[in-house]
C-alpha cells in the first residue's frame, strides 16, 4: 500500500526530494498556521510528516505525530553566477532528509547590559 506524506512548506517538493522518499503520495499544505494543532487531522491522515517550519512548530509537529517520522530536508546553498553580471542567484540543492527525534526549547529573558 502506498504511503501518504504530508509536506508542510510554501515551496513545492522537488523531484529529487520526492524520489528519495520512494513510493509516497505527497499532500502539500501551503498556508500560515499559528499551531500545528490546526493540522491535527492532516497529521493523523499521513504516514510521513515532512516540514519546513520554525523550531517551535517543529516541536509541535513532533508531539502530534507520535511514532510517525517527522522529517526535514537538508540542502546545500549554492550561489550561481549570472551570465548578465547581475547579482548571483541562490539555489538550494537537496542532500538528504533528517528525522527529528527530540526538540527541547529552553529560554530566558535577555536583558542587554
Provide a role label for each language-model segment.
Residues 1-50, 57-113:
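Long, low-complexity, Lys/Arg-enriched
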